[in-house]
């Protein structure tokens, strides 16, 4: 019986494919510029890869269309889906942060005015963060160029992923506070994981301990 692996499009794809290649599972065709395929079978015929949006990886795993997935912790926190979180794979580091305009009067999250507007692609994470601190805010969901929200006056702050901080700096923004760190996580379909589907635990162990060339 084949095991299906959900691979994330975007920043984590290259690292995901490298880790799978390190244990003999090659979905490198997904990286080719001319590739239009969304499903691939590896040479052994034992594994199938699904190339999906990062936000959809835990959805495919939770519903059992994939038994294994690799996805950022940020997506898991945002989606809150019932998947087995098997391991932190350590690559693809970034952080979820609150940021404001560098010339704003705010020097900490506590300085933000009550009921101020906060823009984010990660409204679940943002809501949880501000509720834990008992800071009432109005969340504005955006799905691209979140940095524009403070620059245009739409919002006083944003909650977004930060990698190097270059994008924030280039757009005149500064981090106020880190909410959490995010790296690539290995996840599995909960029932398959609990019942020990044939070959699943062996595969998960290999992915977890794979020696990936630097």
UniProtKB/Swiss-Prot annotation:
It is an enzyme of class 2 (transferase). Pathway: Amino-acid biosynthesis; L-histidine biosynthesis; L-histidine from 5-phospho-alpha-D-ribose 1-diphosphate: step 1/9. Belongs to the ATP phosphoribosyltransferase family. Short subfamily. The gene is hisG. Transmembrane segments: none annotated. GO terms for molecular function: ATP binding; ATP phosphoribosyltransferase activity. Heteromultimer composed of HisG and HisZ subunits. Catalyzes the condensation of ATP and 5-phosphoribose 1-diphosphate to form N'-(5'-phosphoribosyl)-ATP (PR-ATP). Has a crucial role in the pathway because the rate of histidine biosynthesis seems to be controlled primarily by regulation of HisG enzymatic activity. This is ATP phosphoribosyltransferase. It is found in: Cytoplasm. It catalyses: 1-(5-phospho-beta-D-ribosyl)-ATP + diphosphate = 5-phospho-alpha-D-ribose 1-diphosphate + ATP. It comes from Gloeobacter violaceus (strain ATCC 29082 / PCC 7421). GO terms for biological process: L-histidine biosynthetic process. PROSITE patterns: ATP_P_PHORIBOSYLTR. Keywords: Amino-acid biosynthesis, ATP-binding, Cytoplasm, Glycosyltransferase, Histidine biosynthesis, Nucleotide-binding, Transferase. It comes from the Bacteria. InterPro entries: ATP_PRibTrfase_cat, ATP_PRibTrfase_CS, ATP_PRibTrfase_HisG, ATP_PRibTrfase_HisG_short. SUPFAM superfamilies: Periplasmic binding protein-like II (SSF53850). Lacks the C-terminal regulatory region which is replaced by HisZ. GO terms for cellular component: cytoplasm. Pfam families: HisG.
């Amino acid at each position: 019986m084949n095991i299906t692996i959900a691979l994330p499009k975007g920043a984590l794809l290259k690292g995901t494919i490298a880790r799978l290649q390190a244990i003999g599972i090659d979905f490198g065709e997904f990286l080719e510029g001319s590739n239009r395929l969304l499903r691939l079978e590896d040479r052994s015929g034992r594994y199938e890869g699904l190339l999906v949006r990062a936000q959809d990886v835990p959805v495919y795993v939770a519903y059992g269309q994939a038994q294994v997935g690799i996805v950022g912790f940020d997506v898991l926190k945002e989606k809150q889906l019932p998947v087995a979180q098997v391991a932190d794979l350590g690559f693809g580091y970034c952080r979820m942060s609150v940021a404001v305009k560098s010339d704003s009067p705010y020097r900490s999250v506590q300085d933000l005015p009550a009921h101020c507007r906060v823009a984010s692609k990660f409204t679940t994470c943002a809501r949880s963060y501000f509720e834990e601190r008992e800071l009432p805010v109005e969340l504005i969901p955006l799905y691209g160029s979140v940095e524009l929200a403070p620059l245009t006056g739409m919002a006083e702050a944003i909650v977004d992923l930060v990698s190097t901080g270059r994008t924030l700096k280039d757009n005149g923004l500064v981090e106020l506070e880190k909410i959490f760190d995010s790296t690539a996580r290995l996840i599995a379909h909960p029932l398959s994981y609990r019942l020990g589907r044939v070959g699943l635990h062996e595969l998960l162990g290999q992915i977890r301990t794979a020696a990936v060339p630097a």
